[in-house]
Structure formats: C-alpha cells, structure tokens
C-alpha cells in the first residue's frame, strides 16, 4: 500500500476502470479508482475489498482424479513420461470457467503416442476451459489412457488428507481462487479541511473471470455480510410501528403447509409450478437445482432444508415469502388450495 500527495478536486463519489488488459489467457489485469473519499476511508475500503477478492470469490477446479489400479501417487504408468504425482500437479493448474454448483464429472480418454492437453478433457456443458493448451501428460507409446475427473466450484484453498486409495482415486488440493493478486494504493488530494483520498485498486485474475467481474462479486459478498445488521435494525423497531405488519420470525413454510393439509378443496399444490411465481432468476435457479419444481415441493421444505441449498441466501428466503404472500394471500391459502 502506497500513499502519495497529489492535486485534485472534490467531486461526487464515483468509481471507474482506468486500465484493462489481457496479458495472457490466464492473466487478466484491471486498474480501478474510487474517489473522493474522506481521510481513512480509502484504507477501510481497500482492506475490505482486498480480503474479499482474495478469499471470497468462487472458482471452479479439478478436485479428484481416478487412474485405475495405481498403488500410490508417486507411481509411474508404463508408456507415460510423467509420474502420477506430476499429472496431478498439472491437473491442479487447469483453469476452468463455469457457473455450476455442486460436483460434476469429467474425463480424459485418449490413445498414444501424443501429448495430452486441457483440450482433451471431456467436460459437462456448463464448464469451459480457459487455456486449452495447458499440458497434462505425454504418451510416448501407443497405449490407451483414461482418467475420471471430479470438478467442483468452491472458494479458497481446500486440502485433503493423503491416503492410499486402492481404487486409484486421488484427491487434488483445490485452489478455488480466480483472483491471483490484489494491490491498492492511496493518493491524498487537497489541503486542510478540503483534503480527501483517491483509492487505486489493481486486480489480477486467472482468466476464469475478468477483474471487473471479480470486483463486482467481491462487492456483492461484502454487502451480503452486512445485511444481517440491517435486518437486526428492522427487527428492533418499536412494536407500535410494526403492530400492523406481518413478518414471520422464521420461514414458516412448514407451518403453512400444515394448515393447507387441513383443507381438501381447491387446486392441487402439485399443479402449481414455481415458474408461475415470478421469482427472480437467481432464486428460481437455486430451487431448480434442488429439484423443487412445484409449490408442493416448496412448501414441503423447512427453512433448514432451503438454507442448505447451494448459494441460497437469507434474502432469497424473504423474497420467496413475499412472493407467496403476493400471489397466494392468506384467505386464498386457507379456502382455495389443497392437495
């Protein structure tokens, strides 16, 4: 972090990208500025964004490889120049781009002699290779070579204990960190009481997303971290201000479902699809990934079930509740809907 004195003028707080370039397929660079900030604010924003960029951005990588009957990772395979450990290290370096959630399967199946590169990986449709020229192994003889791979989207650095896997399956220490480096510098402007700061932020990524995309995701994650404090303030409002408002203390889908089961007339809940509820695309996709397709599926879930869904957030919970209240008012729920 660097501080310098520069001349400048006070203006409305704004940010912009002042430099963007692609150094290689696996190295993107972006430089951004945010100004004007009061003294000390640039440090606050810079530190928070740097931590969020390096530790909170999700990435996709290969987490496991299965070779067949290989006694240990230091073994060599006849006809292949690299050892199993070297192949695992090469697979660890493969950069993938995707929006998948959960674990997916991939594979490599080729016949030598030939070089094996990232383009030989057979991937699910939702996954894309950033640099297809990344090396994996060299087959020096005419042999058949197949590997089963496991792909996962996560964040940070994940390690697994090394074991002697008799089925030839070996974990790969996953580095789910699309942001390679972050640096920020602070420039002071003006004199006396008019002094303010400009924050310069530099971001390097591995090509699976652009620096601008990384900055947006990091900012979104920081906002999500502070949302509970805003909700706490709302919950602390006086009873007089809220006595006519209905805010469920918990996501009481299960309680609502119990009430619905008591009624036997009306439209079956399994005939109402979540497509009809006008949910946001993000919430809709979360539910679809969890095989929730109808209102019956949704109301059968508890709050804990929903919060266990990958990428499902507290605000998604509130959005679903508000949507149900909008389209299925309480009197209709009590008098019209049943199984």
UniProtKB/Swiss-Prot annotation:
Listed A to Z, the keywords are: Chloroplast, DNA-directed RNA polymerase, Nucleotidyltransferase, Plastid, Transcription, Transferase
Q: Give the GO cellular component terms, alphabetically.
A: chloroplast; DNA-directed RNA polymerase complex; mitochondrion
SMART domains linked to this entry: RPOLD
* MF terms in GO: DNA binding; DNA-directed RNA polymerase activity; protein dimerization activity
Enzyme Commission number(s): 2.7.7.6
The places in or outside the cell where this protein is found are: Plastid, Chloroplast
A GO BP term, please?
DNA-templated transcription
Which positions form S-S bridges?
none
What reaction is this protein's catalytic activity? RNA(n) + a ribonucleoside 5'-triphosphate = RNA(n+1) + diphosphate
Stretch list, region Alpha N-terminal domain (alpha-NTD): 1-233
The main place the protein resides is plastid
Q: Which domain of life is it from?
A: Eukaryota
> What InterPro entries does the record point to?
DNA-dir_RNA_pol_insert (IPR011262), DNA-dir_RNA_pol_RpoA/D/Rpb3 (IPR011263), DNA-dir_RpoA (IPR011773), RBP11-like (IPR036603), RNAP_asu_C (IPR011260), RNApol_insert_sf (IPR036643)
Which portions of the sequence form the region Alpha C-terminal domain (alpha-CTD)?
A: 264-339
Instruction: Show the domain comment.
Output: The N-terminal domain is essential for RNAP assembly and basal transcription, whereas the C-terminal domain is involved in interaction with transcriptional regulators and with upstream promoter elements.
How does the record describe its quaternary structure? Answer: In plastids the minimal PEP RNA polymerase catalytic core is composed of four subunits: alpha, beta, beta', and beta''. When a (nuclear-encoded) sigma factor is associated with the core the holoenzyme is formed, which can initiate transcription.
Q: Hey, which family's this protein in?
A: Belongs to the RNA polymerase alpha chain family.
Q: What does this protein do?
A: DNA-dependent RNA polymerase catalyzes the transcription of DNA into RNA using the four ribonucleoside triphosphates as substrates.
This protein is called DNA-directed RNA polymerase subunit alpha
Which organism was this protein described from? Secale strictum
Q: What is the lineage of its organism?
A: Eukaryota, Viridiplantae, Streptophyta, Embryophyta, Tracheophyta
């Amino acid at each position: 972090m660097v501080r310098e004195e520069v001349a400048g003028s006070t203006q409305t707080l704004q940010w912009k990208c002042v430099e963007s370039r692609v150094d290689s397929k696996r190295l993107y660079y972006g430089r951004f500025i945010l100004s004007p900030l009061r003294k000390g604010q640039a440090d606050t924003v810079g530190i928070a964004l740097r931590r969020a960029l390096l530790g909170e951005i999700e990435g996709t990588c290969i987490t496991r490889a299965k070779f067949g009957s290989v006694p240990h990772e230091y073994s060599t395979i006849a006809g292949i120049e690299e050892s199993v450990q070297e192949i695992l290290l090469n697979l660890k370096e493969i950069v993938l781009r995707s929006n998948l959630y959960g674990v997916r399967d991939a594979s490599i199946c080729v016949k030598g002699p030939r070089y094996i590169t990232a383009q030989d990986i057979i991937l699910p449709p939702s996954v894309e290779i950033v640099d297809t020229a990344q090396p994996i192994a060299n087959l020096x003889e005419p042999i058949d070579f197949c590997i089963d791979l496991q792909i996962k989207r996560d964040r940070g650095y994940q390690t697994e204990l090394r074991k002697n896997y008799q089925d030839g399956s070996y974990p790969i220490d996953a580095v789910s960190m699309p942001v390679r480096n972050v640096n920020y510098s602070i420039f002071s402007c003006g004199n006396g009481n008019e002094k303010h700061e400009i924050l310069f932020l530099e971001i390097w990524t591995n090509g699976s997303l652009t620096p601008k995309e990384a900055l947006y995701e990091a900012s979104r994650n920081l906002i999500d971290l502070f949302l509970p404090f805003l909700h706490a303030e709302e919950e602390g409002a006086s009873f007089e201000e809220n006595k006519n408002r209905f805010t469920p203390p918990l996501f009481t889908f299960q309680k609502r479902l119990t009430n619905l089961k008591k009624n036997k007339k009306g439209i079956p809940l399994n005939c109402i699809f979540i497509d009809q509820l006008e949910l946001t695309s993000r919430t809709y996709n979360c539910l679809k990934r969890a095989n929730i397709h109808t209102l019956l599926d949704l109301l059968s879930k508890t709050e804990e079930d929903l919060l266990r869904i990958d990428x499902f957030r507290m605000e998604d919970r509130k959005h679903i509740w508000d949507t149900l209240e909008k389209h299925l008012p309480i009197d209709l729920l009590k008098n019209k809907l049943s199984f």
